[in-house]
A protein has these predicted regions:
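Flexible, glycine-rich active-site loops centered on histidine and acidic residues
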Residues: 2-22, 86-120
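N-terminal beta1-alpha1-beta2 module of alpha/beta enzyme domains
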Residues: 1-79
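Catalytic metal-binding/acid-base residues of hydrolase active sites
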Residues: 50, 82, 116
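Conserved strand-turn element in the central/C-terminal portion of the radical SAM core barrel
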Residues: 80-86
Length: 120
């Protein structure tokens, strides 16, 4: 059996507008990923959302993945999901970043794509 954890920078309610809480959320979720790595969990998935105040504060999962790759040894780190919107960015740019991340994580990068909740 394989285990995974999903992280998205969740900050509930009024705390979502507190920049200190955002920092603490990032640190706490990094600790979850490091704990999961030490306990042989297979995957850590990081969501991507923009301009949401009470659901997800994580707008740059690739940055978080770079940090987590340096702090972990075994767990696979992935985006959940990158929404491919040509209006936002050309899909080739996503492919380039995924290939680069795979090198820096020693083949532990997992790229997830699909239609997100806010996709149109």
């Amino acid at each position: 059996m394989e285990f995974a954890i999903f992280l998205n920078g969740f900050i509930p309610g009024p705390a979502a507008h507190d920049t200190n809480m955002q920092h603490l959320s990032y640190q706490r979720e990094a600790e979850y990923a490091i704990f999961a790595d030490k306990h042989n969990w297979k995957y850590c998935w990081l969501g991507e959302h923009h301009a949401l105040t009470e659901y997800s504060q994580l707008s740059a999962p690739e940055v978080a993945i770079g940090y987590l790759a340096a702090q972990t040894d075994y767990i696979h780190l992935g985006t959940a999901i990158n929404s491919l919107s040509p209006r936002k960015e050309h899909p080739v740019r996503y492919a380039e970043r995924a290939a680069t991340m795979d090198h820096y994580t020693n083949n532990r990068f997992e790229w997830g794509t699909g239609r997100g909740a806010g996709s149109h």
